[in-house]
Each structure stands twice: as structure tokens, then as C-alpha cells.
Amino acid sequence: MLVELAITLLVIALFIHLRPTLSAKSKSLRHLPNPPSPKPRLPFVGHLHLLDKPLLHYSLIDLSKRYGPLYSLYFGSMPTVVASTPELFKLFLQTHEASSFNTRFQTSAIRRLTYDNSVAMVPFGPYWKFIRKLIMNDLLNATTVNKLRPLRSQEIRKVLRVMAQSAESQVPLNVTEELLKWTNSTISRMMLGEAEEIRDIARDVLKIFGEYSLTDFIWPLKKLKVGQYEKRIDDIFNRFDPVIERVIKKRQEIRKKRKERNGEIEEGEQSVVFLDTLLDFAEDETMEIKITKEQIKGLVVDFFSAGTDSTAVATDWALSELINNPRVFQKAREEIDAVVGKDRLVDEADVQNLPYIRSIVKETFRMHPPLPVVKRKCVQECEVDGYVIPEGALILFNVWAVGRDPKYWDRPTEFRPERFLENVGEGDQAVDLRGQHFQLLPFGSGRRMCPGVNLATAGMATLLASVIQCFDLSVVGPQGKILKGNDAKVSMEERAGLTVPRAHNLICVPVARSSAVPKLFSS
């Protein structure tokens, strides 16, 4: 008893002794100012009334002109900090990420429709580390990705065959729609082993992920769950959950039959499916962290949200820029002809030998990042650039603004892929897309960077190269007629979404480069 009392008193004394040290950081931060902020801050809505542009990144640019590259707002009752330079990005996402900015902000739609288990959104901790390791080591490792290369090639050839049919019939093709089908089918087959059943409902999920509600930012409304937004979340969930449940059960039946055949794979059966790996982990009783069915469902949604809309939208932007910049289109075609030739279809393995194609991908992401505003959440009060960043604050990184800033890019409004090839001795590797160059962060940076960056960029580059190799694209105007001469331009107007797509679908009549083109992808 005396020993226990002595230990208790010792712990109390030690805490009292260390308390000034433990709280010194917090106390010192109290003397620091908050980042500049507009006045006044209105009741309930905070500064939401200042977001008066159709798209968030434009409103944030206007505010940064008045309040500087680092400023604070209130989105309803939520403190929000906006950063607009690569130097600030580095402080948040590298210097202080581990201690304060390792978690993302999620809306009520994302939380519900990922079963509160999105690896992209869950707090940094043991579960996140385990799942992230599983994704990198077991799903997106080089061996698995290479085994799935024929599948990805099949999906690209499907797109090319549709384009060839349009070219032959002279019927305009909704290229935007075909790109969404391509990415959705590719991810669905890799993730689930099938392409069709989940496609339509997945689009509804992605659409609402790109929306916000006042209930996400005004705390008295969060528990009420009123309005159409919350009803739509419930409706989508009630339609999506039975579909993904059926897909999982179907996969479990396939696995059961395969075990009865001692692991033998039937002819025509897909041998590598990400869902199989997740089910293997879920059924393994020796795993330190048990994966539940809800967590598997959340990961399925993660893969769709990360790999379908963003890649399709980026590819749509790239094709539109190529149409509007025929010099770039022709230069890319000359590179493909020189490296690949005209007798076979360009392949994913060729991309490493096509630096100009890779630079087109980078230039597209510079001008049209899939996430123009990257979001994080502050989990611990922190000092950044002489200002205090409060715990719980939403952090916004205006990636779009940096991509158009003349301070960091020469002639930033021009689509000029050559900029990535002008560093002598480094080539297009001088600036990469993996979060180490803070003036170009289309996939984020640090621990929360998109793990599928290599897969996404390789797929996008391969499809672009395939289209350039095989077709010219004649733009169809609103009246359904092919545009000629100076009028043959694609509108680059943006609209809101999970990513920021073009406001109008890309409608074209493909023109086969030669009569031999269909033979390149007929098999």
C-alpha cells in the first residue's frame, strides 16, 4: 500500500515538474497572431458569403490578393486557413505534417458512403498505417500492377474501337463519356473482377463527394440531418450498399469454387483481383489488425473515387488542350512515330521512352490539377510562418493558383509541355508528380499523397499516346456540326465537381490517320 502511494505521489510530482515544459509550446503560441482574416465575420455563416465565385479556387485567389498568401476564414463555425505558395505548402506538408497536418477533412457524404473507413480520410494511426502498407505492398506493388497490364490494355483498345466506329460512321462521339467508361471499367475490373454492375451507382457516389452542405461547416446543423443533401446521401447509400454487398458475395462464391478446384483458375477467369487480396486479409485470423467487411467496402469506394473521375477528367483536359494546340499534338505524334513506329500500337511499356508525352501529362496537371484545392485538417495547434494554426482548423492549399502563378512558371497560361524538358541533364524528371516539388502537387504530398499516382499517370499517358497515334479529332459544335479553322476550338470553361471538369463535354468525330489504323487494336 505504501509502495503504491509512493509511486502515485512520484507520478504527480513528476507531472507538476514537467507541466510547464509540456504546456510551454501551447502558451508560446498564444502570443502569436492568427493569419490575417476578413472583417466582419458573420454569425453562423462566418465568411462563406465571401466565396462569391462559381468555383472555390477563384474565390480563394481573390481573397489572397487582399490578405496575402496565408490567411484565415471561418467556413460557418469551422476555422479555415488558406495557403497559396509552394513555400507554405512545404511548411504544412513536410515540416509540420507529422505533428499537425496528417489528417484530411471529410464531408458527411464521404464519411457515410465510405462507411467511415476511407483510408484517404481516417485519422493517422495504426489502422491507417496498416491499410496504407497493404495498398502499397499488396495491391499496387510492381508485380501486381504488371500482371494487370493486359487488362488495362484491353480497356484502352475498347476506347479506340469505339472511336474507330465513330470515325467510320461519321457519327459524333461523346469523348468525355467514353473516358469515364474507360476509367470506371478499368478500376472496376482491377478492384472487383467485373465492370458493369457498380458503374452507374459509383457515378452518383462520386458526384455527391464533390458537393458540400452547410451542415458540414455549421456545427448546430450537423446533428439535425435536414435537407435534400442528407436525404440524397441516404438514398445513394441505400442503393449502393446492396450492390457492393452482391459483388462481394459473388466474389466469395468464385473464391470458394476455386478452392474446391485446389486453386485452379478457369479459362477466361481473371486471376488478379484486388478484392481477393482484401478478402484474404479479412479471413486471416493471424492478422494483427482485422479487416471488416465495412472496411473493405470503404476501400472499394476509395479506389473508385481516386481512380475514375480524376483520371478521366485529366485525360479530357489533355485531349482538349491538344486540340487547341495542334503544334503540341503534332510534336507528340512525331515522337511516337520515331519511338514506336506505325506498325504496332503504343503500349504502356513505351511510355518511359516518350518524354514529350510524359511532359504533356505534367503540363495538363499543372494547368488543370484534379484537386485544385487540396484539404487537410490540423490535429494539433502549430506555428506556421509566424502564425498560430488552431487545432481542428480546415487547411486549404490552392494548388490551382500556384500552377498559374508567373512567379513559379514562365508564361503560365500557355500549354507548353517543353517547359519540363528544358532543364539540361535532367529532362522531364526535373519536376515530378510525387509531391516533392511543391509548385506541382496534383496528387498531394507527404503521407496523404495519392498512392496510385504511378498507375494513374501511366494509364493516362498510354491512352493519350494511343489516340494521338491513331486519330485526329474534329471538334463538333453545339449545333452538331464539325467546326472548321479558327472556330475549331474547345471551350476550356470549368465547372464544379469532385474534381474540376470542363463545363462542356468533349464531342468529336475521330478521323483515322490511315485505313490501317483499326488493325493496330483489332486483337
From Swiss-Prot:
Cofactor: heme
Impact upon substituting L371I: Production of mainly 3-hydroxyflavanone
Entry protein name: 2-hydroxyisoflavanone synthase
Substitution effect: L371V: Total loss of catalytic activity. 5% activity and production of mainly 3-hydroxyflavanone. 0.1% activity and production of only flavone
Any single GO BP term: isoflavonoid biosynthetic process
Species this protein is from: Glycyrrhiza echinata
Compartment annotation: Microsome membrane
Coiled-coil annotated residue ranges, if any: none
Family affiliation: Belongs to the cytochrome P450 family.
Record-listed E.C. numbers: 1.14.14.87
Induction: Up-regulated upon elicitation.
Further comment found in the protein's record: Lys-375 is essential for the intramolecular aryl migration of a flavanone molecule to produce the isoflavonoid skeleton. Arg-104 and Leu-371 are essential for the correct P450 conformation.
Reaction(s) the record says it catalyses: (2S)-liquiritigenin + reduced [NADPH--hemoprotein reductase] + O2 = (2R,3S)-2,4',7-trihydroxyisoflavanone + oxidized [NADPH--hemoprotein reductase] + H2O + H(+); (2S)-naringenin + reduced [NADPH--hemoprotein reductase] + O2 = 2-hydroxy-2,3-dihydrogenistein + oxidized [NADPH--hemoprotein reductase] + H2O + H(+)
Membrane-spanning segments: 2-22
Role summary: 2-hydroxyisoflavanone synthase, which catalyzes the hydroxylation associated with 1,2-aryl migration of flavanones. Converts liquiritigenin and naringenin into highly unstable precursors of the isoflavones daidzein and genistein. Acts only on substrates with (2S)-chirality.
Swiss-Prot/TrEMBL keywords: Endoplasmic reticulum, Heme, Iron, Membrane, Metal-binding, Microsome, Monooxygenase, NADP, Oxidoreductase, Transmembrane, Transmembrane helix
Gene encoding the protein: CYP93C2
